[in-house]
Design a protein with these regions (language model features):
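Short, small-residue-biased leader/transition segments that mark boundaries at the very start
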Residues: 15-29
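Short, well-ordered junction/capping motifs at the entry into regular secondary structure
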Residues: 4-19
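Polytopic alpha-helical membrane proteins, predominantly small-molecule transporters/carriers
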Residues: 1-3, 30-320
Length: 320
């Protein structure tokens, strides 16, 4: 959640923000591996674990990073087109729903009470629908103010958010499959600890970033093409905020993978997907994206917040 706040504060284009934050993320993952992943009495150290990981586990974790990176780039583009309070709840919310199902079905270990998990997911789905209705009513209210191009741009942003959400729903399970989720202290041979799996995941992000960012910079979804010189023209303070956001994201994500060994991948993944609420809060209260909307829009947004929080709460207690 804090990662989103730092990235929003890191003023710049989506590619500049993501590149800087991912540099911070890789750096944070490296430090985590050589500290938390290497100290202690039990289990394999980070370096020893990295040496024995099978090629299948490496490919799975790296593929998760590549997919995550692509989904984030598309989600950032959708945010610039449709607005933060619309794009993030749609993209991340869809990723939450599909991701929970994916992790529950395809990742081993005790996943918790399916009734509570999928009831929580159902509430999140209703919250997403309410968000879409609120966005539509807001759009109808502003129809006289917007041009056809503006409406088309917003729709394009929503489509990108949906694609990003579908892609994002798959990355967690790919990384989890590279780990022995039933025994983090002494993982089976060829499988990784959370620290090693997340390092490989971050490598996939970093390497693919050069390809994906180059394409998006040359063929942007909106605006004029830019070069890498634009990135280096940015202020150091701007880059450092992005790096800090990446470090926060890296620490939060590796803790999520560690937690999956105790509470199950589907629950751990869901609890790490509180991003839509923070994004919606920023969109509503900071950027005033719904300012001047009808009272029904405000009611729908309030219900969305309540249902999303209750849904996450049900998922959180599913293991107990």
């Amino acid at each position: 959640m804090l990662y989103i706040c730092f990235c929003v504060l890191s003023v710049g284009g989506p590619t500049e923000i993501l590149t800087t934050s991912f540099v911070g993320g890789v750096r944070g993952v490296e430090e985590t591996g050589f500290t938390l992943g290497s100290f202690g009495e039990g289990g394999r150290s980070f370096v020893d674990d990295l040496k024995q990981v099978s090629s299948a586990s490496v490919l799975s974790a790296v593929a998760g990073g590549i997919i995550f990176n692509l989904s984030n780039i598309l989600l950032s583009a959708s945010t610039s087109l449709a607005g933060l309070s619309i794009a993030f709840p749609v993209g991340c919310g869809l990723a939450l729903v599909l991701g929970v199902v994916n992790n529950y079905l395809f990742v081993g270990g005790d996943q918790g009470d399916p009734v509570l998990i999928f009831s929580g997911v159902a509430l999140v789905m209703v919250a997403l629908i309410l968000n879409g209705v609120a966005a539509a009513k807001k759009g109808n209210g502003e129809a006289s103010k917007e041009t056809g191009n503006a409406a088309s741009t917003a729709k394009k942003g929503v489509v990108l958010a949906i694609i990003a959400g579908v892609l994002m729903s798959t990355f967690y399970a790919l990384v989890a499959r590279a780990m022995d989720v039933t025994n983090f202290e002494n993982p089976a041979e060829g499988l990784a600890t959370p620290y090693t799996a997340f390092f490989l995941f971050a490598v996939g992000i970093f390497v693919s970033n050069f390809l994906f960012n180059t394409i998006v910079m040359k063929k942007p979804f909106e605006g004029e093409p830019v070069g890498y010189d634009t990135y280096f023209k940015g202020k150091l303070s701007t880059h450092m905020v992005g790096v800090l956001g990446g470090c926060v994201w890296g620490l939060g994500t590796v803790l999520s993978y560690i937690a999956s060994g105790k509470i199950g991948a589907s629950i751990s993944y869901a609890l790490g997907q509180g991003a839509p609420m923070i994004a919606a809060l920023w969109g509503v209260f900071i950027w005033k994206e719904f300012k001047g909307s009808k009272s029904i829009v405000n009611i729908l947004l309030s219900l969305m917040f309540v249902l999303f929080i209750v849904g996450l709460g049900m998922i959180a207690v599913a293991k107990s």
